[in-house]
């Protein structure tokens, strides 16, 4: 089987980021984003997606975390897009419901080649620690635009904003894991009647 890995470096005047992903990993993560809460969420993606994920980032955190969080989403999206290559033999679609105590989120993904995000979440507070919850949508928007996927994220219930966020990232990891799984019955086939994604 081909190695489904990718490494992407993104350098701008605002951020310097390197992301490495192995889709057939063991859920190991090496994370240094400079944003501790984001590292915690990225760890959920790796652990529940069973991806090996490395993120090293330096950003203009003296301004705020916006550029760093968004650009990590962009770079992760680019890495995923490279790792899935032509998408032959992939399941393509993935979905997951994940609870954490009172919180429950649903994530559905399609490796469609068409970027689209539906983000239906109302967080119960504006910050988690010192992390602005608006940046969660910015992360996923950056990811979607560069991974070229359709992504639906719905927080169905929750009172604790940390729990809401964590269920979203865990469900995302699990849905993505399902979508990138290879189906031996479709070994050399593109999972689309178009013949291309």
From Swiss-Prot:
A Pfam cross-reference name: IGPD
Recorded hits in InterPro entries, A to Z, give: IGPD_sf (IPR038494), ImidazoleglycerolP_deHydtase (IPR000807), ImidazoleglycerP_deHydtase_CS (IPR020565), Ribosomal_Su5_D2-typ_SF (IPR020568)
Describe the reaction catalysed, as an equation.
Answer: D-erythro-1-(imidazol-4-yl)glycerol 3-phosphate = 3-(imidazol-4-yl)-2-oxopropyl phosphate + H2O
Positions of transmembrane segments: none
The entry lists its GO molecular-function terms as: imidazoleglycerol-phosphate dehydratase activity
Q: Which UniProt keywords apply?
A: Amino-acid biosynthesis, Cytoplasm, Histidine biosynthesis, Lyase
GO terms for biological process? L-histidine biosynthetic process
The leader peptide range reads: none
Instruction: Identify which top EC class this enzyme belongs to.
Output: lyase
As recorded in UniProt, its EC number(s) are 4.2.1.19
Localization annotation: Cytoplasm
| GO cellular component term of the entry, any | cytoplasm
Which pathway does it operate in?
Answer: Amino-acid biosynthesis; L-histidine biosynthesis; L-histidine from 5-phospho-alpha-D-ribose 1-diphosphate: step 6/9
Supply the CDD domains for this chain. IGPD
Instruction: Write out the similarity annotation.
Output: Belongs to the imidazoleglycerol-phosphate dehydratase family.
Q: What is this protein called?
A: Imidazoleglycerol-phosphate dehydratase
């Amino acid at each position: 089987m081909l190695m489904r890995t990718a490494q992407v470096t993104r350098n701008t005047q605002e951020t310097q980021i390197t992301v490495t992903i192995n889709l057939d990993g063991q859920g190991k993560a090496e994370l240094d984003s400079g944003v501790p809460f984001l590292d915690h969420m990225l760890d959920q993606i790796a652990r529940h997606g069973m991806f090996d994920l490395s993120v090293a980032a330096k950003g203009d955190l003296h301004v705020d975390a916006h550029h760093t969080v968004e650009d990590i989403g962009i770079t992760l999206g680019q890495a995923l897009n490279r790792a899935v290559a032509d998408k032959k033999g992939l399941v393509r679609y993935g979905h997951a419901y994940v609870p954490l105590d009172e919180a429950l989120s649903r994530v559905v993904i399609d490796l469609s080649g068409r970027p689209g995000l539906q983000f239906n979440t109302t967080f119960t507070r504006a910050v988690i620690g010192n992390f602005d919850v608006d940046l969660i949508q910015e992360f996923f928007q950056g990811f979607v635009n560069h991974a070229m996927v359709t992504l639906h994220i719905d927080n169905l219930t929750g009172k604790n904003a940390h729990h809401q966020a964590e269920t979203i990232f865990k469900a995302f990891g699990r849905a993505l894991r399902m979508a990138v799984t290879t189906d031996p019955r479709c070994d050399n086939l593109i999972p689309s009647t178009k013949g291309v994604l």
